[in-house]
Amino acid sequence: MQIIPAIDLLQGSCVRLHQGDYDQVTRFSEDPVAQALEWQRQGASRLHLVDLDGARSGEPTNDSAVRAITAALSIPVQLGGGVRSLERAEALLSFGLDRVILGTVALEQPELVEQLAARYPGRIVVGIDARNGKVATRGWITDTDTEATSLAKRFEGLGLAAIVSTDIATDGTLAGPNLTALRAMVEASSTPVIASGGIGTVSDLLSLLPVGVSGVIVGRALYDGTVILSEALQAVGDGRLQDASSSQSSPC
């Protein structure tokens, strides 16, 4: 299981939101490049970026920081937030990102996911953010009636790199992951699932091992110091998330 540190970007700074609330922002660093380099130094094998401005408005405002981070790191970097067009996804990949994460468009324009997955096999991730099991979009502002697991099933066989399953209720709370929701997601999809939301301790990380997720995104716990990345990697063991091309001989 791969442990993936998160950097959430808001107006060029590293921040964390509490349960996705833009009115509950904690700023951790004004230098996202330095922070990214620190996670790499501690042993991270992948970095997760979120463009919170893009997620909320659909307009990219953190591209300079994203470019600087990808240029500075030797580990792969993935990004989500505001990726709502073919042109935007391709622009981000041209920055040197390893993967782009499609959230809102996965529900609103599923054909775009299919198009990008075919064009960039193993580099497209679907982000499914859920509140009480139902998908939320546009920076977690808009609630829908779509079941998270149903959306995951929609993209079976496309050769996605992964699904990032975020539980909004636990995100930024350090209260522990929603194991029930994660089990349901793993059972619903053959695509590798990356857990996101609620990690507060190394014990929380260990609780994910029997669930079968391929990775876990950790944010606030690293910044608050309740999880030390180097210690967590030693406790859990850090394996690189296999992309779809290596985990199966052909799309199912």
From Swiss-Prot:
GO terms for molecular function: 1-(5-phosphoribosyl)-5-[(5-phosphoribosylamino)methylideneamino]imidazole-4-carboxamide isomerase activity. It is found in: Cytoplasm. Gene3D superfamilies: Aldolase class I. The active site is at D8, D129. Its main location: cytoplasm. Transmembrane segments: none annotated. One of its GO terms (cellular component) is cytoplasm. Keywords: Amino-acid biosynthesis, Cytoplasm, Histidine biosynthesis, Isomerase. Coiled coil: none annotated. GO terms for biological process: L-histidine biosynthetic process; L-tryptophan biosynthetic process. This is 1-(5-phosphoribosyl)-5-[(5-phosphoribosylamino)methylideneamino] imidazole-4-carboxamide isomerase. Its EC number is 5.3.1.16. CDD domains: HisA. It catalyses: 1-(5-phospho-beta-D-ribosyl)-5-[(5-phospho-beta-D-ribosylamino)methylideneamino]imidazole-4-carboxamide = 5-[(5-phospho-1-deoxy-D-ribulos-1-ylimino)methylamino]-1-(5-phospho-beta-D-ribosyl)imidazole-4-carboxamide. PANTHER family: 1-(5-PHOSPHORIBOSYL)-5-[(5-PHOSPHORIBOSYLAMINO)METHYLIDENEAMINO] IMIDAZOLE-4-CARBOXAMIDE ISOMERASE (PTHR43090:SF2). Belongs to the HisA/HisF family. Pathway: Amino-acid biosynthesis; L-histidine biosynthesis; L-histidine from 5-phospho-alpha-D-ribose 1-diphosphate: step 4/9.
